Structure formats: C-alpha cells, structure tokens
Amino acid sequence: MATKFPKFSQDLAQDPTTRRIWYAMATGNDFESHDGMTEENLYQKIFATHFGHVAIIFLWASSLLFHVAWQGNFEQWIKDPIHIRPIAHAIWDPQFGKPAIEAFTQGGANYPVNISYSGIYHWWYTIGMRTNNDLYMGAVFLLILASVFLFAGWLHLQPKFRPSLSWFKSAEPRLNHHLAGLFGVSSLAWAGHLIHVAIPESRGQHVGWNNFLSTLPHPAGLQPFFTGNWGVYASDPDTANHVFGTSQGAGTAILTFLGGFHPQTESLWLTDMAHHHLAIAVIFIIAGHMYRTNFGIGHSIKEMLNSKAGLVPGTNSEGQFNLPHQGLYDTYNNSLHFQLGIHLAALGTITSLVAQHMYAMPPYAFIAKDYTTQAALYTHHQYIAIFLMLGAFAHGAIFWVRDYDPEQNKGNVLDRVLKHKEAIISHLSWVSLFLGFHTLGLYVHNDVVVAFGTPEKQILIEPVFAQFIQASHGKVLYGLNVLLSNPDSVAYTAYPNYGNVWLQGWLDAINSGTNSLFLTIGPGDFLVHHAFALALHTTVLILVKGALDARGSKLMPDKKDFGYAFPCDGPGRGGTCDISAWDAFYLATFWALNTVGWVTFYWHWKHLGIWQGNVAQFNESSTYLMGWFRDYLWANSAQLINGYNPYGMNNLSVWAWMFLFGHLVWATGFMFLISWRGYWQELIETLVWAHERTPLANLVRWKDKPVALSIVQARLVGLTHFTVGYVLTYAAFLIASTAGKFG
C-alpha cells in the first residue's frame, strides 16, 4: 500500500479520519515535530530551503521583466512617464465581450492589459534600463541565477556537502560574512552600478556591456581617489534645471550630498543615493571584520554578553546597557525560534520604515506623481509589516514554551522580564484603556455635536509637540522659529550645514507643499494618531501577554506542558480555554488588521486631499466619526459601486468584482469563527448520510471518515478568511478609488 500523506508523520498518515489532512497542514512547517528529525538535520534542511527561497524570488523577478518586455509599454512610457500608464501584462480572457475588451484596452496598447501599480517601471528607469532588450537580458540573467541557486540547494542536501551542526552554530564567522559580504559588498556593488550605469544614463550617456569597461564614470578617473582629493567627485553636480535622461543641465559629480529632490523627477538625487550606498558599504565591510573567528582577534560575542565591565574603564555594571545579559549567547544560538523572533521583529520594523520613506522621500524618478502606485506601495508595505511583527511575537512565545531554560538564564534580562510580567502587562492594559476611552470619547463628542448642528462645540486639539518637531526639522509654516527653521540657531550654523552641503536642498523640500515630506498637521491628525497609539498598544498588549504567559500563569501554572497551541484542559479545569499562546496570536491578528486599517485609511485620505488640491476636506471631516464614514469610505467607494452599472462596464469593473469577492471571503470567516464543532459535526454527518443514499453520487466514496475541525483549526480557517477578505476588500477600494480619480 502506498504511503499516505503526510510522509513526515507516521502517526498522522495512519489516521483513518479527515484529521489526517488538517493536522498534516497544521504541522507541515513544524519541522521539529517531524519523524526522525535531529537538530543537525533540521539546520541542514532549513539551510537548503533558503536557496530554494532565493531561487523563487529570482524566478518571480524574472517573470516581471519578461512580461513587461513582451507585453508592456516600457519604451513608450519612458518618453512620457507622467501621462502614460505603465502596463504590467496582457489579459487573455475567453469571457470578455466587446465592452470588456474596449474597457481594458488601455495604456496605449491595442489589446486588453493590466496596469502596473508596483513602481517597477520607475525603478528600472531610475537604475538605467532604457529598452525592452535590457529587460529581456535581465530576465534571462535572473533565470540562470535561479537555476544556480536551485542547484546549490539540492547540492547542500547531498551527504558530502551537508554543513555540520558546529558550522551552523559558529555565530561570529556567520555575522562577519553577512555584515561584510551580504550587506557590505552588495551595497558596494550597488553603488558601483549607480555610478557606472545609472548616473551616466540619467545624463543621456548609454553604458552597456559593449562600453562599460571603456567609459569613465567621472572625467578625472581614479586619480582623485588615490591622491586623497575626494572632493572632486562631489563638485559640479547636476543643476536644478537638469532634464532626467539627457545631458541638458547635467553635471559630472558622482558622490554628492545635495539634499532634497531633483526638481523635475521629484525623487532623491541619484548622486546622493550612490554616496549613501558607498557609505553603507564602508561601514558594513568594517563591521564584518569586528568579530572573533579562528584567528583569535576581534570581539567574542559571548564575552561581551557575559561581561560586567562598565563603560568607563575600571568601573562595573550589571552588563550591556547596565542590564544583565549573561547566558544569552547560548540561549540565542541554540534556539531557532528566538533567532526567528528577533529577525522578524527587525524586518517588520524595517518594512514599516520602507512604507514611510518610499512616499516621503521617493527614490525613483517620477514615482511621486504616480499616485495609485504610491498608495499601493505604502499600503502593501504596512500590511507586510504587521504580519512580520505578529510572527515575531508568535515565535517568541514558541521560544518560551520549547527552548527557554530557566537555569541557564538565571538573573538575566529574560528572567527579569518573566519575573515582573504582571507590571508590564498591567501597564500596557492601563495605557490601552486610557487611550481608548479618551480618543473614542473625543471622536464621539465631536460626532454628536456635529450631528446636532453645532460643529463649533467640537473639542479640537492642535498637535503642538509634533508641530514643534516638524519646525525643528525646518518647516517654517507654523512660525515656531526653532532649530532648523531658525537661520541663527546652532543647528543651522553648525558645520557642515553652514558649509551649504545638504541643508538648502532639504529646506526647499520640507517647505515645498507639493510633496509628502512632513505634511502639515492639525486636530484631525492629533486624534487619528491617538487612535493609532490605542491600536498599537492593544495589539502589543495581547501579544506580550500571550508570550509572557506562555509558560504558565496563576490560573494554569503548568501551561508550558501543553505546548504552544491547545484548546482547553478539559472540564476539570474550568476557564482554561482560550489562554494558549496561539490564542493570543489569533486575537492579536484582528487588532493588527484594525491598526493597519486605520493607518492606511488616514494615509490615503490625507493624500487624496493633497493630490486633488483640497486639503480642507480632510481637515474639516476627520475630527468626527461620520466624517470618516461618509467623506472617506462612502464617498470613495462610488467608483467601485459604479464598476458595473446599467450602461455596461469600465476598466474599474475588475476592482468592483474584487471588492464584492473580498467581502464574501471576509464574511465566510465568521461562519468558522462563531459556530463551533458540534454544529459542523452534525452538518457533516447529515451530508454524508444524504450522499451515501443518492444514486450516482454514492459511487464516489471519501476514503477518510469526515470529522469536524478542532476548535483551534476552525479558528485558523476563520482567521485566514477574515484576513484575506480584509486585504482583498481594501486593496480593491484603494486602487479603484485612486485610479478612478487620477487615471
């Protein structure tokens, strides 16, 4: 008899019910629990999958390049990037009638196409790509690279090429290689590409495979580098009237610190970005030589973490930052969940920072004027950030349950956090309650007085502290005259600002009023930022409580023996349902989605006003609840509701359909979240009974006995539907409402 799925668990493979499939899906990624898994084997398998992961990413990027080169309008778009819509790919759909074909024939194509809202056209244009041939070459190169990585993944699973456990556990050499190689050298390579290819292309000089070895990126060559006269590379930058992609107004500088934006493209100066990547490369290559390896020189991380020396030589401290870190080296180095938790937290934070910086300081030429792309990229990165952060806390909780050793960590920061968890959790609870009641109280008060026809009775609070911070960065609108908004202040006159390096470009940008840098803020912003604070603190409260109580609580001291996810400990211990670390993750996901919803609503509505030249609507309507419901959500769903109407369809119809479909998926989630096992078991048994007694239908038999989902599984299915529906609904709303206004 053939082995049944799943191969990784003989126990499950022999289960006669449909549990087999569901539990296999649930434990598929829980490699530690698989049959015959050793620690060494686990590390080797995870290592090999990294190659596969990178190969898939290259394959995906290759497909973007290929489809745009084949079916897109890259060469036409370059000629007029502000007015021509970039095409992602063609649409072949046998259901399309004449109206649909006409509606989706857009962007200068003569067949139905999808418009691209990812910003890849702007990126390729900025980094020096100019022809479809460039795109095809990139696609083929990435395809070859993907094959190399797939082979490398396979190779590292062969007995002779499997790294040993000690290799995986040598933290210092890995850190050196990742810092110097992964970050340092790749940043250096990117700086090289910008200097040798992108900057010349932006000045109308083509650099290709045929001439890149013979074309000097700077007229002085390497002489200034070797003679220490580095300032030459910064002199003669592009002028304010430079036309991107031509030599008109172009300079010769390759490494600058101009600050602000290129006036025509409204993106950061390419020469500033090359300088930035070169600086990053230098820092990280130095950092990659700091840690002790076989040569016995450099820092030992274990010694640093265990050290009790003070900052001043001869003094003592409790440890790094005056906090006890002893025992952390082995705890971290021997727990994949600890490592994954920290990496996800770091990556989640960075992803949110990317969302903020991509619109405030756009790096790609003309992307600032592609409003739908700006909205899509901000929303995309903020959504990814919340999921990464949720994962960080989830794996942190699994670490507490599976990997934490109280003896090894006695008296260090982990031990301390566990010992005063009540204080941490109650403070988070207090601040969430405070923010919730006060923020909602203000919104509800304002809502009521507006409804009663006395809007002048609203409680409106100016965000004076935030305005002070904006002013100190150079925003003069508020008249606060502090730091960079005061030409006589020390911030303004200190070197290198006074040396006219970057300050003028920055001040022009922050005070321009047409970009998204330090937006003008008022009472509506004050209120919504307190709503964000409420949502973030509540999400963190649920996650932190779930992680810190994962090993045990007063109610259930032996919780860690039940693992990361368990439904209840039976009727004998009443009240032990819904308190596993998994349940905290489950509840926190709803709050995280709530948070990212409010954040993206705010960002989008605020920007719609700026882009349409009507900031008054946001300022006036955002201070009360009905303003948000009516003037943001309802008013902007008009395009979606009109996707199909009695007169036929238009190119927003696909988003109208997705909007409806998203609601359907979202609503399906409640079926799993609200009705529980007994209902489903009875329903399944009734359906099976009917099936087995229906002619023809009863010729087909399900081999496994149908069993309802467990409570935890039904929650997971419900949560997944809720999340996917939420994402699809807002994505359709965002793109249709923005594209409907700006094309």
UniProtKB/Swiss-Prot annotation:
Pfam families: PsaA_PsaB. Phylloquinone binds at W680. Keywords: 4Fe-4S, Chlorophyll, Chromophore, Electron transport, Iron, Iron-sulfur, Magnesium, Membrane, Metal-binding, Oxidoreductase, Photosynthesis, Photosystem I, Thylakoid, Transmembrane, Transmembrane helix, Transport. Disulfide bonds: none annotated. [4Fe-4S] cluster binds at C568, C577. PSI electron transfer chain: 5 chlorophyll a, 1 chlorophyll a', 2 phylloquinones and 3 4Fe-4S clusters. PSI core antenna: 90 chlorophyll a, 22 carotenoids, 3 phospholipids and 1 galactolipid. P700 is a chlorophyll a/chlorophyll a' dimer, A0 is one or more chlorophyll a, A1 is one or both phylloquinones and FX is a shared 4Fe-4S iron-sulfur center. The chain crosses the membrane at residues 46-69, 135-158, 175-199, 273-291, 336-359, 375-401, 423-445, 526-544, 584-605, 652-674, 716-736. GO terms for molecular function: 4 iron, 4 sulfur cluster binding; chlorophyll binding; electron transfer activity; magnesium ion binding; oxidoreductase activity. Chlorophyll a B1 binds at H663. It is a multi-pass membrane protein. GO terms for cellular component: photosystem I; plasma membrane-derived thylakoid membrane. One of its GO terms (biological process) is photosynthesis. It catalyses: reduced [plastocyanin] + hnu + oxidized [2Fe-2S]-[ferredoxin] = oxidized [plastocyanin] + reduced [2Fe-2S]-[ferredoxin]. InterPro entries: PSI_PsaA/B (IPR001280), PSI_PsaA/B_CS (IPR020586), PSI_PsaA/B_sf (IPR036408), PSI_PsaB (IPR006244). Chlorophyll a B3 binds at M671, Y679. It is found in: Cellular thylakoid membrane. PsaA and PsaB bind P700, the primary electron donor of photosystem I (PSI), as well as the electron acceptors A0, A1 and FX. PSI is a plastocyanin/cytochrome c6-ferredoxin oxidoreductase, converting photonic excitation into a charge separation, which transfers an electron from the donor P700 chlorophyll pair to the spectroscopically characterized acceptors A0, A1, FX, FA and FB in turn. Oxidized P700 is reduced on the lumenal side of the thylakoid membrane by plastocyanin or cytochrome c6. The PsaA/B heterodimer binds the P700 chlorophyll special pair and subsequent electron acceptors. PSI consists of a core antenna complex that captures photons, and an electron transfer chain that converts photonic excitation into a charge separation. The cyanobacterial PSI reaction center is composed of one copy each of PsaA,B,C,D,E,F,I,J,K,L,M and X, and forms trimeric complexes. Belongs to the PsaA/PsaB family. PANTHER family: OUTER MEMBRANE PROTEIN, OMPA-RELATED, PHOTOSYSTEM I P700 CHLOROPHYLL A APOPROTEIN A1-RELATED. This is Photosystem I P700 chlorophyll a apoprotein A2. It comes from Mastigocladus laminosus. The gene is psaB.
